[in-house]
Amino acid sequence: IFLIRLPGELNVTMLDVGQGECVGIETREHHVYLVDAGSTSKKKTGQYQIIPWLKYIGTRSVEGIFITHWDEDHISAVGELLEWSKSSRVKIRRIFLPDVALKDEVLETLLQQIEEAEVSVEYLSAGEHMTDGALQIYCLHPYAKKVPEDRNDASLVLRLSQGDFQMLLTGDLEKSGEDWLVEQARPAVEQPQPAGQEQALPCALSTQPAGQEQALSRVPSTQSAAQEQALPCAPSTQSAAQNPLRCTILDAGHHGASNATGEALLDLAQPELVLISCGKNNR
């Protein structure tokens, strides 16, 4: 387990799930989120790694699980968590998925599990964000209804922002997706807006008490892939507003593989620390 603790504010934990991914987020209000939940090198990851952590921090509910994409090493424990939620007092309130034009048998099975557990599903695309107290979670990828080359290309890219802390999580996004992110971010870097004039994000989701969850407002996209707008920027600090990819901590793409986390992305992100979630003999 790798723990990033901001005293009294925000805890981010990268769980040791071997060749897989699971990042836990706990706000100062003790609201808990997960980004992915899976492994291909460890069996029963939910039972032996994720659920014990949830019990350790004493959570009463998981406000949401962000599934960057549905490869096994990112979702293998989701079914376990849903079953545990049905039989325990810890409820999973929502699951977030990338809003892409790609469906396959694995996704259909996952959606069926979610439906049977009576958990709501929200689809995210670039430009949308949610607020939970002081924590802002921005979606930077994919653009709405993207037709991805494969599951990796469908990956959610999330940016956590609270005060002067930012964390970028890129799922298994590879070079073509990173190139798109960099292209969208460059206008904000090359022509930064003055403080106080940052462009507002088009929609927001505020976390409400149990039973009062607000539906995610969406802005339909009518642009083609080649005509997508630059990523809007409205984080909490001026430096972040000038560069939507700038981060304190970067969760390396595709478990640190050579076809991800390229120099162009690193040049814009300029992380102080890079984390890699992987197992033995990772390539």
Name the predicted role of every residue range.
Residues 1-283:
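Non-globular, low-confidence helical/coil segments that flank catalytic cores
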